Amino acid sequence: NPDIDKIISYAPELLITQSPIANKDTVRLSEAGISLLTLPAPSSLEELYDNYAALADIFAGSIEGNSLAENTLADMKSAVNEAKNSCESIVFIMNIDGDEITAGTGDSFAGDLFSVFGRNIAENDTDYTTTAEELIKADPQYIFLARPLSASDFDSGLAEQLSAFSEDHVFSIDASLTERPTARLAETIRSVSEVMTGTNAETTEFTGGYAEIHETSGQ
């Protein structure tokens, strides 16, 4: 939760947050002369774009702001267009607990992001939840894991039924890259796409049937 006392001590004109602020704290901020802008946490790339546009509008005005937002997001949108159809099907998994799998579902930012590359097999699931049965049935071409999750966390019986394991199409990636969506996502999108298309093998190191995507110096 935001430290309201510390924020008030800094005396900003405007507080921008994606975290809910309690009513009593909203009153305190107002009494201190601090305006409050709450932006929704994006659940899709389009909503992320909208947040940038809203911020640009506030600080630069509607006309100049639209241009500023487009310039800021140009590289990300270019990376998205370049990455489309990098694979046939994909899934991003954050946790495994028996048959229950936490994944980037269609109603999440992570799910929408990975849908850029190909069909997200969890796109029709919600609340970050899918199952081992659904995973086996869909048999995604590529599986991405949120570190520290690795191939060894998969039950051997489950892994044997997924072609991504036998074809070395299992990769791990820093989950914070999808949890804190920023314009730097362009680098992540390109790295993931290059791994699947084989255009930058230096970003990966295969170990035990899967590979870790190394962060670039710009991330």
Please identify what each model-predicted range represents.
Residues G104-Y128, H169-S172:
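His/Asp/Glu-enriched short active-site or ligand-binding loop at hydrolase and phosphoryl-transfer sites
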Residues N1-I58, T129-S166:
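Acidic/His-rich segments in extracytoplasmic proteins that coordinate ligands and/or metal ions
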Residues E47-F59, N66, E70, A83, ...:
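Structured C-terminal subdomain patch of bacterial secreted/periplasmic proteins
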